[in-house]
Amino acid sequence: MTKLTITRPDDWHVHLRDGDVLTDTVRDTGRYMGRAIIMPNLVPPATNVDSALAYYERIKAVCTTNFEPLMVLYLTDNTTAEDIRAAKASGKVVAAKLYPAGATTNSDSGVTDVKNIYPVLEAMQEVGMLFLVHGEVTDSSIDIFDREATFINNTLKQVVADFPSLKIVLEHITTKDAVDFVMGASDNVAATITAHHLLYNRNHMLAGGIRPHFYCLPILKRNTHQQALLAAAASGSKKFFLGTDSAPHAKDRKEAACGCAGSYTAHAAIELYAEAFESVGALDKLEAFASFNGPDFYGLPRNTDSITLVKRSWEVPATYPLGDTGVVPIRAGETIDWQVED
């Protein structure tokens, strides 16, 4: 296959950051994504409807396409049921996000114990707001490669049991454990999968030298988990959909003695997913994963226009602009096999 036309995709998990970098991040994500779920882990985080709506306006102010940001509340131990009801009433906030305190970038204000937000989850279940989950424990005694599976067993299974009508997205899954859990759970439980977790495993990050631009959270796992993710994405199951978790950091914040977690893929997201699906002979499953399963789960209409991918190799720049600095993208200086037709 040398050409593939699909319904315009959406990104159900992206970090746009804030301030002077928005022009660059919104350009890259909005180039061919119709909508995106915007992560709220700013400094300070978007913890209430007012801060979420103000962030929405800052994003829209730099949009040059019809791209529509879908806003998310950042949950804390102090979030209230009234915060949820106000966010739902806004029409712009579609979900609320659990960051276990300290799990990832700018998560220090997150939830210290999920039981602290049970009244909030009750309100979310009542009003029909989705619950997005960064599924890792933060206990320093738990091996970093085991933190997702431990979170599922110790926390998420109980939440799913306690809130059977709550729609839950386990974000950026990285393990066979997560695939099996989502597949075995009710139709109210789904997951996003990133392009980099489909294309890479921990050998790419650690073998033959440390490659900091592959360092993200949840961390890349062994190749058996990568294969499980590919099988899930290409299975045709409606429970899995596109979420890039594209997370820009300035070059010097990544190439450092203590580098930041996050991989940048917004420059070529759908192209990278096309490579991943092609690698398992499943290009025919890409459209549902990228364009149908997400809006269907969120109860939103599918996009009505389309994009066309062509099999044409192109070289990725060494950096992309990021405010007054630069971000090193995944596949920098290398080629990608697919390209979106202008």
Swiss-Prot record:
- Top-level taxon in the UniProt lineage: Bacteria
Q: Which residues does the annotation say bind Zn(2+) 2?
A: K97, H134, H172
Q: Which residues form a coiled coil?
A: none
Q: Which residues are named in the active-site annotation?
A: D245
Q: Which SUPFAM superfamilies match?
A: Metallo-dependent hydrolases
Protein function: Catalyzes the reversible cyclization of carbamoyl aspartate to dihydroorotate.
This chain belongs to the protein called Dihydroorotase
